[in-house]
Amino acid sequence: MDFINIEKKWQEFWWKNKSFEPKDDFNLPKKYILSMLPYPSGEIHMGHVRNYTIGDALARYYRLHHYNVLHPMGFDSFGMPAENAAIKHGIHPKTWTYENIEAMQKEFEALGFSFSKNREFATSDPDYTKFEQQFFIDLWEKGLIYRKKAMLNWCPNDKTVLANEQVIDGRCWRCDTEVVQKELYQYYLKITNYAEELLKDLETLEDHWPSQVLIMQKNWIGKSSGLQFGFKIADECLKACNGIQEIEVFTTRADTIYGVTYIAIAPEHPLVEHAIKRVSQEDSKIIKAILNTTQRERALEKKGAFLGIYAIHPLTKQKIPVWVANFALANYGSGALMGVPACDERDFEFANLYHIPIKVITQSLQNLPHTKEEVLKNSGEWSDLSSSVAREQIIAYFEKENLGKRVINYRLQDWGVSRQRYWGAPIPMIHCKHCGIVPETQLPVTLPEDIVIDGEGNPLEKHASWKFAQCPKCHKDALRETDTMDTFIQSSWYFLRYTTPKNQRENQAFDQNYLKYFMPVDTYIGGIEHAILHLLYARFFTKALRDLGYLHLDEPFKQLITQGMVLKDGAKMSKSKGNVVSPKEILKKYGADAARLFILFAAPPAKELEWNDSALEGAHRFIKRLYDKANAITPTTSKPEFKGVILNEAQKLARKKVYEALKKSHEIFNKTESTYAFNTLIASCMEALNALSAQNNERILCEGYFVLLQILEPIIPHTAWELSERLFKRENFKPIAIDESALMEDFMTLGLTINGKRRAELKVNINASKEEIIVLAKKELEKYLEKASVKKEIYVPNKLVNFVIA
């Protein structure tokens, strides 16, 4: 079998005939199958191969069954690696990026992926940037983007800001460098405006998304209900607070309010800037040190300092000391917390560390802290009530007395989207001394190509002819925004752009007819590592564009498949571990079909896949055997029929196995709750080929191949097309009805029991009468019944025979 030339032949055929382009007929049933687009690093890895093989199998199946399939691919082509390559190799980021795209396109083609070429694009293409910049302006004008100065996560290696979601355990999500804090201006997308909708709409995805992803998003959004109220600054401290009169806090445990013995505020809290003058030099150093540490460092150990001021408890009127604490976060709630050491582990630890008093407010005799809800004491009129009852009554009291109010809080923070780098989509804003921040009117704002990238800061800041611009409003001298957009913006709407053909994209982000027809994506495939980054942002962006009038839908992805990692020697493949398997080498040695077959057979999509060379060789052998066995078949253009034909057991088994595989194929691809266990489908096909090989009827072999090659086309397309063309002129690439008669059993197996205890099994003809079955059952159980007196004979059709004996 010359797999190299066979694969090349069909790849050229598909390309020449535009075999994978969706039709413009909006009356056809559609399927939009999408794998997450890759960063164009220059070469694909086995993780890519697995992801795209899963998606391609789905797309090919639905095409065979007369769906209008959109199965596109593009490239997430902005980002830091291109700038790093420019520094390392002295090559322009644009040149490096587009050369890599070309190389990856060839690899995709070599794997037989059935992508629509007419939908392909890179997110760094100017006509993509043009509409992204228009979205940015629209969001700005609608109030969904704002700019402010804040302490931000800064990656010293990439020299750029990171969103909270891009900091993993205190390190940069991309390069693993430890993140520090830096004060900068930043544009923010108001994702918090959509927190409740993002949370509520998770319910619509429950039967179609992995539960783990739903839980991760729910926790990240972090909805909580509680009491918001203020501690008034003590009169003698007001002067030091420069007009700030109270400290606002939020708590989900209003029932513990009588246990407050200190207030903890974040070092970024506005009170600190003024009151820090009252503290000792040593405490001032502690506060400033906390200010310059990342959230990860703050979580390692509790640290704080007394701010030298007091606030008044709203109920007891006692003075409560105000502390700066590293566990109080400026970006959650108001940046202030009430410290209740008797009822909270963290508060207890901090109080013990700094010898802050602890007030017990529960009747439990257990060791402190009492974190569970219990009966209260030392809690004024709410003593002797349970925590839950007291909590509701205290909130009601605060609202009645105008001391506070019940509010909903979210852990989710607004999305910072400014990045201090060159290779990204320019933020289309102009800074004018006279007009303020003004949106650009000439789009797209493109990047200058005559730049020097040396790793020192943002190259756009140093490019005078690009940076200095004219205000679109007053036409006076102004400065162009030099930050570029977070690349997660590009991946938050690319799936919408795919719906529109290339020749209709110039003047519109997407054509409404195509958009309404193809969206939402029916099946989306990618790694679970994107659960709270890309997937959350894409959901938000869809809703925001809907509210701008661009879209008609609430959720972008109907079904989500999160494929597991590809491992070798028990670890994720990486160059540093020396366990990388090159797709190019696999294709050269075994071919694309063998690689695809192994990928789909080795493990279900959601599970991790352990690389196994011998299993890959086994996949190659199966394809060769399938190919060689086809030589015994006489070409035809129709499936042989067997109505009324008498067959022997081997022949019946062969037909049964073939149609079992066909039935399993439909179940795997079409069931709503399907886990896409391609491994079980492939196992069924292997069983069918074994059964076909064990019988000697050429017409049954022909029928078997007619069906099997259709089943296998999504998995090993080159081989399936080659054999189907040769044997059947591809007439088998149409929906095939399951021959139910082939699945009917001639025999059934019955359980044989005595007094309900199972003793044996009996295989009998399915048409045998009750009397015949009883006789055969007695004979089978002769050794148990010969000395017994049978009182009753019970036959449960198709299941068992039971004898009741004395």
Swiss-Prot record:
Annotated compartments: Cytoplasm
Keyword ATP-binding: yes
Motif ('KMSKS' region): 572-576
Alphabetically ordered keywords of this record: Aminoacyl-tRNA synthetase, ATP-binding, Cytoplasm, Ligase, Nucleotide-binding, Protein biosynthesis
Listed Pfam families: tRNA-synt_1, tRNA-synt_1_2, tRNA-synt_1g
Motif 'HIGH' region, residue range(s) on this chain: 38-48
Protein name as it appears in the record: Leucine--tRNA ligase
Species this chain originates from: Helicobacter pylori (strain HPAG1)
